[in-house]
Amino acid sequence: MASYFDEHNCEPTVPEEQYRQNALLELARSLLSGMDIDLGALDFTEWDQRLPPPAAKKVVESLPKVTVTPEQADAALKCPVCLLEFEEGETVRQLPCEHLFHSSCILPWLGKTNSCPLCRHELPTDSPEYEEYKQEKERRQQKEHRLECLHDAMYT
């Protein structure tokens, strides 16, 4: 007797794709039954598996240029990317998280990704899809927090 997969000329689903297929089936069932669905609960963007886009050009250009003070130079403050010490009077770039970098180190980095190499503080991007993903992720976290607070309030 032939197996189900041989009989239907198909391959078993790999576990990584199981969630996506289940989500698509759930969407199809909801549409066929005419039910209202929460499209926010279905995440087809898959940004978690992709690298974030580069930082917005306007944001990168507007990063403040800071002059290294004698105190910073005496403290042997280093660029976290190239690990060279900053010299007194040298002009460096400061990210919103207040980390300092050589321009020649941080500009190529921000041309590839939108976060600080040290603390992962994210800068805005020019990608509307990624910005929408970040907003949706924040909304989900807020919703989970509200539900947790409600649950805790019920059982305290």
Swiss-Prot record:
EC numbers for this chain: 2.3.2.27
Coiled coil region boundaries: none
Keywords linked to the UniProt accession: Metal-binding, Transferase, Ubl conjugation pathway, Zinc, Zinc-finger
Catalytic activity: S-ubiquitinyl-[E2 ubiquitin-conjugating enzyme]-L-cysteine + [acceptor protein]-L-lysine = [E2 ubiquitin-conjugating enzyme]-L-cysteine + N(6)-ubiquitinyl-[acceptor protein]-L-lysine
InterPro entries in the record: Znf_RING, Znf_RING/FYVE/PHD
GO biological process: protein ubiquitination
MF terms in GO: ubiquitin protein ligase activity; zinc ion binding
Broad enzyme group: transferase
Keyword Transferase: yes
Pathway: Protein modification; protein ubiquitination
Annotated zinc fingers (RING-type), start-end: 79-120
Role: E3 ubiquitin-protein ligase which accepts ubiquitin from an E2 ubiquitin-conjugating enzyme in the form of a thioester and then directly transfers the ubiquitin to targeted substrates. Catalyzes monoubiquitination of 26S proteasome subunit PSMC2/RPT1.
Family per similarity comment: Belongs to the RNF181 family.
PANTHER family xref list: E3 UBIQUITIN-PROTEIN LIGASE PRAJA, E3 UBIQUITIN-PROTEIN LIGASE RNF181
Identification of the protein by name: E3 ubiquitin-protein ligase RNF181
Native organism: Xenopus tropicalis
